[in-house]
């Protein structure tokens, strides 16, 4: 996680309730993918070495001395050139040495192609985005529907509180206690249609007008604090990997720092079901010292208000 961007979102509509107009604090951590110096280095070295193995194997098949024997073109002195020409280089037999070298050369070319293809697509790149809402939030649609008061309901020549009570009777007939978000649009269309049975039931009689179009407003999405993890993958259904977890699902931030031949420097997101989601770009990490890794993990745990675990 190389960079951190703090963004405040202030795009709210006029219909957004006041308790939802809290600007969330958003942090974005940019993740470096396959386009790093080490991948460029190994892709070049593997490609160069595999070409050398393949040319040596081909030269043994055609009984050439060596396709990479270039002293005739890069000699800097005639005396050195004449002395080198007197040396007879051994001819490599095609079976089994040349055949094995051709195999390793082709295998190396496939590996280098995989590395260059990963670099081109920037596999593993993405970001970790954290949304923290500090204001009052509602976790269910029923809580939102219960919070609607009579001032939000409008009617033509009718008491809005009576419409609300009649509507509750209607919803109880449908085995629901409050306005259901999934059927709100359908219910809104029925209430604005004077000839519908729902409208006649809600108004309580023919002398009462139906609800206006603004009586029911679409239910806004519930803003819950969450973390979004986005990564670029290989072409196919997993080209875009987009994971989202609620802050309530996060139990801790796990820090792993292992030294040695197979070093490991990672920051993981530990969920309540004991799953661990990698937050860094690679198992080797982007930090040189343990202090840098610890500082990044502690800031993240403090921002999420969760525990910090160590593993070494």
Curated annotation (Swiss-Prot):
Its main location: plastid. It is a multi-pass membrane protein. GO terms for cellular component: chloroplast thylakoid membrane; photosystem I. Keywords: Chloroplast, Membrane, Photosynthesis, Plastid, Thylakoid, Transmembrane, Transmembrane helix. InterPro entries: PSI_Ycf4_assembly. It is found in: Plastid, Chloroplast thylakoid membrane. The chain crosses the membrane at residues 42-62, 91-111, 113-133. GO terms for biological process: photosynthesis. The keyword Plastid applies. Belongs to the Ycf4 family. Seems to be required for the assembly of the photosystem I complex. PANTHER family: PHOTOSYSTEM I ASSEMBLY PROTEIN YCF4, PTHR33288. This is Photosystem I assembly protein Ycf4.
């Amino acid at each position: 996680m190389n960079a951190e961007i703090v963004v405040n979102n202030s795009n709210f509509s006029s219909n957004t309730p006041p308790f939802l107009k809290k600007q969330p604090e958003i942090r974005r951590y940019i993740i470096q993918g396959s386009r790093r110096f080490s991948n460029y280095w190994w892709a070049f070295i593997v490609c160069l070495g595999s070409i050398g193995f393949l040319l040596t194997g081909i030269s043994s098949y055609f009984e050439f001395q060596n396709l990479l024997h270039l002293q005739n073109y890069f000699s800097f002195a005639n005396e050195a050139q004449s002395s080198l020409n007197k040396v007879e280089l051994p001819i490599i037999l095609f079976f089994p040495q040349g055949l094995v070298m051709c195999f390793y050369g082709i295998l190396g070319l496939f590996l280098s192609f995989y590395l260059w293809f990963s670099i081109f697509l920037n596999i593993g790149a993405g970001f970790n985005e954290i949304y923290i809402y500090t204001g009052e939030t509602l976790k269910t649609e029923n809580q939102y529907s219960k919070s609607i008061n009579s001032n939000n309901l409008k009617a033509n020549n009718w008491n809005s509180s009576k419409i609300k009570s009649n509507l509750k009777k209607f919803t109880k007939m449908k085995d629901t206690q409050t306005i259901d978000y999934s059927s709100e649009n359908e219910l809104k269309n029925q209430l604005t249609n004077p000839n519908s049975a729902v409208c006649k039931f809600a108004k309580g009689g023919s002398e009462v007008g139906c609800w206006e179009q603004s009586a029911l407003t679409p239910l806004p999405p519930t803003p819950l604090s969450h973390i979004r993890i986005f990564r670029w993958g290989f072409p196919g259904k997993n080209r875009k990997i987009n994971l989202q977890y609620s802050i309530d699902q996060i139990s801790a931030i796990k820090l792993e720092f292992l030294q040695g031949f197979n070093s490991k420097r990672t920051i993981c997101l530990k969920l309540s079901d004991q799953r661990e989601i990698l937050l860094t770009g690679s198992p080797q990490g982007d930090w040189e010292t343990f202090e840098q890794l610890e500082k990044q993990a502690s800031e993240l745990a403090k921002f999420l208000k969760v525990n910090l675990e160590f593993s070494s």
